Amino acid sequence: MLDPKILRQNLEHVVEKLRRRGFEMDSDTFLQLENKRKEAQLAIQSFQTKRNQLSKTIGMAKSKGENPEPLMAEVSQLNDELKQEEANFETIQKAFSDFQLAIPNLPHDSVPDGKSENDNREIRQWGAPPGFDFTPKDHTVLGERDNQLDFEAAAKLSGARFVVLRGSLARAHRALAQFMLDLHTDQHGYEEVYVPYLVHEECLYGTGQLPKFREEQFQVAGDRNFFLVPTGEVPLVNLARDEIIEAPALPKKWVAQTPCFRSEAGSYGKDVRGMIRQHQFQKVELVQLVQPENSYQTLEEITRQAEKVLQLLALPYRVVELCAGDLGFAAAKTYDLEVWLPSQNKYREISSCSNCEDFQARRIQARWRNPKTGKPELLHTLNGSGLAVGRTLVAVMENYQQADGHIRVPDALKSYMGGVDYF
């Protein structure tokens, strides 16, 4: 959520920055709501002032032995009118809050202009795509051996965009997740956290999936108002809800492996085959809560930490800076990591690392105590995929495939795979 002070004091600037990301803010509606809010506030203050004055007059009348009943009746009438005005104010505040919740974050000044992923800027590449003396196969074909990648079984259980992994592929999937967790906890200093996979609706509001992306969420039937997590970012960031963290305890660095559940409502016809776009997939998520002045340095750090996974697995990739029009709803700046897939002869997204500044923190009131002032201030929240496990498995399968269809085990993964060289 944007700072209401910025909206009130520098509305034109906000409108222009939002226009960079293709969002047209209805400034007329904002001004109407703001005027109604001010009018309701003034009315409430006026009623309260009159009531206080009458209360004093009643006290004076009683002290003089005068009949206070007419004045008390007037106070009662004022109280009724005050309650009505307070209810009106709450209605206006709700409309104002709903209006704010629909506004995305402002892009950072360094974010390049652009309308879509076609305008994203490549920052760097690492590694060279492998050369094959045979035509490289798609991961779905490679997975047919011993039926280790079984989409038919998954369809029988759950329908399209699910997968059943068996044997060596299931083990490789588990090994990759464990390798990522070990790297981030042992070398990058993250605290591992196990979190619920069902969260309250307010958690999704807190991180920005709601209200805009409701159709992309899986909501659990019943009266508990649970949602399946679309990313580990949701429970991790919400751990700081309504917390005030002391400065020496910062930064908070949390990592979790969770399943992610997404309806892919806007992805009809995209990546219908294989494991690239699924309703359920595993992801290792990195989250940091930091002091505001450190957040852009931290964004570079998280990006490098996600890159380290790909480097240790010797998977060629590139880093792309998202243009303003391709930013996620809550992000002020984002880097995507895209891994090379030989069968597609192109790079595909495998990680997204974002600085949300105080956008999420304002929604969940995640704060730190500034030792200089002694007062609580909003934190900056950052998140990054470290990495998407299924897509990493796809990249390993395709980049390490052999002519006979077997997959060579990356050196970094051998100890997690029982020391075997191929699977």
Curated annotation (Swiss-Prot):
It is found in: Cytoplasm. One of its GO terms (biological process) is seryl-tRNA aminoacylation. Consists of two distinct domains, a catalytic core and a N-terminal extension that is involved in tRNA binding. L-serine binds at residues 231-233, 285, 385. ATP binds at residues 262-264, 349-352. HAMAP family: Ser_tRNA_synth_type1 (MF_00176). NCBIfam families: serS. It comes from the Bacteria. This is Serine--tRNA ligase. Belongs to the class-II aminoacyl-tRNA synthetase family. Type-1 seryl-tRNA synthetase subfamily. Its main location: cytoplasm. Disulfide bonds: none annotated. It comes from Coxiella burnetii (strain CbuK_Q154). Catalyzes the attachment of serine to tRNA(Ser). Is also able to aminoacylate tRNA(Sec) with serine, to form the misacylated tRNA L-seryl-tRNA(Sec), which will be further converted into selenocysteinyl-tRNA(Sec).
